[in-house]
């Protein structure tokens, strides 16, 4: 699959997730077989550009190309300027966020709230595409309200504006993350457009990825929440698509090694204070369903230093290994549920 002149190594893409898809997470997912990754959304508000959070999000140093920076906002001029800034900062692809359902984003008429104003959508698309000489992509949803899905018009207008690829989440803003993703509309959009279409929503297993690709005809799938604490899902899906067989689930030693490596990267990237706090959610995701994990997490949340946090995690996994832990009943049940979806 191509996005503009860039050929991706495969059709598995890491979804942009605020507070999750930082550079360490994107790098890890690419290591495990993701063909592409999109950054966390970055505000187009110039007054916030030099904030600590914005600088972390715009850090692409040493990242595997192509580098994709997602921008969010509601003012065409500001978004165009933000696109130029991110390209100057190293972005090779600019992604426009019209899909975030978060209340604090939609209250500013950004994210998926933009779908309420198709004229504004068109002006933003035209402004950003005209502002930069790199491919511009769009991440969006089926519409703002159920029963008023306008994705067919928005998608066609995006293609006319020169958007290089469309990533489509199969829900409306009203749905948030409830109900099930509606792949039938993604299929209709794919049949209408000539640009690549990336299917997103509820893709949480190798079987589901294959089903969505086959059913929708999409050029790629975008995986978000299912990769939290499970970055090897890209390797699993890639193997299944190529062979029709499953890779063995990682054992406890492998999970330990991946998590400790991830923590080291987070500490190096964010430093002592933020590194410790940002790592907590990742530790929780990696350990979900493991033996005595609830008690472990409650104790882990109280740790205030990276060194102690690292040691606490290492000790927990060493205890699991000593007890012969392979995979808990909870995890087995979760995997079985995923594979039947």
Please describe what each predicted stretch is:
Residues 39, 93-101, 160-170, 223-226:
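Non-cysteine beta-strand/loop elements that form the S-adenosyl-L-methionine
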Residues 84-104, 110:
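A contiguous, low-structure linker/loop signature
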Residues 4, 8, 12, 18, ...:
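Alpha/beta catalytic cores of nucleotide-metabolism and tRNA/nucleoside-modifying enzymes
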Residues 103-120, 171-183, 245:
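Glycine-rich tight-turn/loop motif centered on a GG-T
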Residues 77, 140-153:
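Active-site glycine- and acidic-residue-rich loops that bind
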Residues 12-16, 37-39, 67-71, 94, ...:
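Hydrophobic faces of well-ordered beta-strands that scaffold small-molecule active sites
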Residues 17-19, 42-44, 72-74, 99-101, ...:
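Active-site beta-loop-alpha junctions enriched in small/polar residues
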Residues 1-2, 17-92:
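Glycine-rich, positively charged N-terminal anion/phosphate-binding segment
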């Amino acid at each position: 699959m191509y996005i503009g002149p860039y050929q991706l190594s495969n059709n598995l893409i890491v979804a942009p997730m605020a507070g999750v898809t930082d550079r360490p997470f994107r790098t890890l997912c690419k290591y495990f077989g993701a063909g592409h990754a999109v950054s966390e959304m970055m505000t187009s508000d110039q007054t916030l550009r030099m904030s600590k959070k914005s600088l972390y999000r715009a850090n692409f140093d040493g990242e595997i190309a192509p580098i994709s920076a997602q921008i969010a906002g509601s003012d065409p001029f500001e978004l165009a300027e933000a696109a130029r800034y991110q390209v100057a900062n190293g972005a090779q692809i600019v992604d426009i966020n019209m899909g975030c359902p978060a209340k604090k984003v939609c209250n500013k008429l950004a994210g998926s709230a933009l779908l309420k104003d198709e004229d504004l959508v068109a002006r933003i698309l035209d402004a950003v595409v005209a502002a930069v000489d790199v491919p511009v992509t769009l991440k969006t949803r089926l519409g703002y309200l159920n029963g008023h899905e306008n994705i067919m018009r928005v998608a066609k207008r995006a293609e006319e504006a020169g958007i290089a690829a469309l990533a489509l989440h199969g829900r409306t803003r009203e749905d948030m993350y409830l109900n099930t993703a509606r792949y039938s509309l993604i299929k209709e959009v794919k049949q209408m457009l000539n640009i690549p279409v990336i299917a997103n929503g509820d893709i949480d297993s190798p079987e589901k990825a294959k089903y969505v690709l086959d059913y929708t005809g999409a050029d790629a799938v975008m995986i978000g929440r299912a990769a939290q604490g499970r970055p090897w899902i890209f390797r699993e899906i890639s193997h299944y698509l190529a062979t029709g067989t499953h890779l063995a689930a990682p054992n406890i030693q492998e999970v330990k090694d991946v998590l400790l490596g991830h923590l080291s990267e987070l500490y190096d990237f964010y430093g002592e204070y933020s590194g410790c706090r940002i790592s907590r959610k990742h530790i929780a995701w990696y350990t979900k369903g493991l033996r005595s994990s609830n008690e472990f997490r409650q104790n882990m949340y109280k740790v205030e230093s990276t060194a102690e946090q690292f040691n606490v995690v290492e000790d927990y996994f060493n205890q699991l290994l000593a007890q012969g832990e392979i995979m808990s009943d909870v995890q087995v049940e979760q995997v079985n549920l995923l594979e039947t979806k």
